[in-house]
């Protein structure tokens, strides 16, 4: 029987010795099973027992690998997703972080779960990303992608900004607020949730717009069709600097009068899970929801 995966990438920037050991254990275990294994080159100075030719950058890993195993928390997954979504690479996560909504394998027992996945017993789902573009004087000045959210916010803490929101070129509303969170369903359990946004099922083709501390009593989160194009027109009277933050990891500078275009990316993250994965079990477990009554 043909194996579903032949080349496997191990990705992640570890913060502690336990995570480093997980990378090392994964590499030697997968190699012993006959897989061709490559590791994120950010670990080349740490994993000195791995041959130098087995390290590659994220883009090269996306080009080579059938499967990428991301070790760490959701931050590592977000950073990898923006690159790996460009390629036909399936992705699974081993949780070495905190909540771990995206990295769901237990690091103490990853071999048992991964054995079944490597044999083809897994659930696959596609998660869409957002593209964020900063337009100035009719030109795109900068752009990036986000798996969770793109956030317009001031460069200063506790500093309001003014902007208008358009959906498919149709004016929707204006805001005087600390900013706006534009979230995917994947990101609805992240920063958007902290801001009072709704939890969206990950398979839903929708985008949520969540105002951050709006200076009005009537402002509420808004969910729109995922194929809509969001345009934020930043007031030319705003003072100071503003930014668009993609997944809290990449910042795009924004000037007064700029336009911000946010829309669904054509790229998809091919996220896989063990067969017993349940999104609602994850929500219940991570968010501390009540158990069954009977």
Swiss-Prot record:
Family annotation (Gene3D superfamilies): Probable inorganic polyphosphate/atp-NAD kinase, domain 1, Probable inorganic polyphosphate/atp-NAD kinase, domain 2
Keyword match Kinase: yes
Catalytic residues in the record: 74
Compartments, record wording: Cytoplasm
InterPro entries: ATP-NAD_kinase_N, ATP-NAD_kinase_PpnK-typ_C, NAD/diacylglycerol_kinase_sf, NADK
Any GO MF annotation of the entry: metal ion binding
Major subcellular location class: cytoplasm
Highest taxon in the source lineage: Bacteria
Reactions catalysed according to its record: NAD(+) + ATP = ADP + NADP(+) + H(+)
Binding sites annotated in the UniProt record for NAD(+): 74-75, 148-149, 159, 176, 178, 189-194, 249
Keyword annotations of the record: ATP-binding, Cytoplasm, Kinase, NAD, NADP, Nucleotide-binding, Transferase
GO cellular component, one term: cytoplasm
Alphabetical list of SUPFAM superfamilies matching this protein: NAD kinase/diacylglycerol kinase-like
Record EC number: 2.7.1.23
Biological-process GO terms, alphabetical: NAD metabolic process; NADP biosynthetic process
Free-text function comment from the UniProt entry: Involved in the regulation of the intracellular balance of NAD and NADP, and is a key enzyme in the biosynthesis of NADP. Catalyzes specifically the phosphorylation on 2'-hydroxyl of the adenosine moiety of NAD to yield NADP.
Database matches in NCBIfam families: PRK01231.1, PRK03378.1
Sequence similarity: Belongs to the NAD kinase family.
The protein's name in its UniProt record: NAD kinase
Gene name in the database record: nadK
């Amino acid at each position: 029987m043909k194996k579903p995966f032949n080349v496997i990438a191990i990705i992640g920037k570890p913060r502690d010795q336990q995570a480093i050991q997980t990378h090392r254990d994964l590499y030697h275990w997968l190699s012993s099973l006959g897989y061709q294994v490559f590791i994120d080159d950010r670990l080349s100075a740490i994993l000195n027992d791995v041959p130098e030719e087995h390290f590659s950058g994220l883009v090269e890993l996306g080009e080579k690998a059938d499967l990428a195993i991301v070790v760490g928390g959701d931050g590592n997954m977000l950073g990898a997703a923006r690159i790996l979504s460009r390629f036909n690479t399936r992705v699974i996560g081993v949780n070495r972080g905190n909540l771990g909504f995206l990295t769901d394998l237990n690091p103490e027992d990853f071999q048992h779960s991964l054995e079944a996945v490597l044999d083809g017993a897994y659930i696959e789902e596609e998660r869409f990303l957002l593209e964020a573009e900063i337009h100035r004087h009719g030109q795109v000045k900068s752009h990036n992608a986000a798996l969770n959210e793109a956030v317009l916010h001031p460069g200063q803490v506790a500093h309001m900004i003014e902007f208008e929101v358009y959906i498919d070129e149709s004016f929707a509303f204006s805001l005087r607020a600390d900013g706006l969170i534009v979230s995917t369903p994947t990101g609805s359990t992240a920063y958007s949730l902290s801001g009072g946004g709704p939890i969206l099922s990950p398979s839903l083709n929708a985008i949520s717009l969540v105002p951050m501390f709006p200076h009005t009593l009537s402002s509420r989160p808004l969910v729109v069709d995922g194929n809509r194009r969001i345009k934020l027109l930043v007031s030319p009277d705003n003072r100071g600097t503003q930014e668009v933050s993609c997944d809290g990891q990449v910042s795009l500078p924004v000037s007064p009068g700029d336009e911000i275009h946010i829309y669904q990316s054509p790229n998809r993250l091919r996220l896989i899970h063990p067969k017993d994965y349940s999104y609602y079990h994850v929500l219940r477990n991570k968010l501390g929801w009540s158990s069954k009554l009977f």
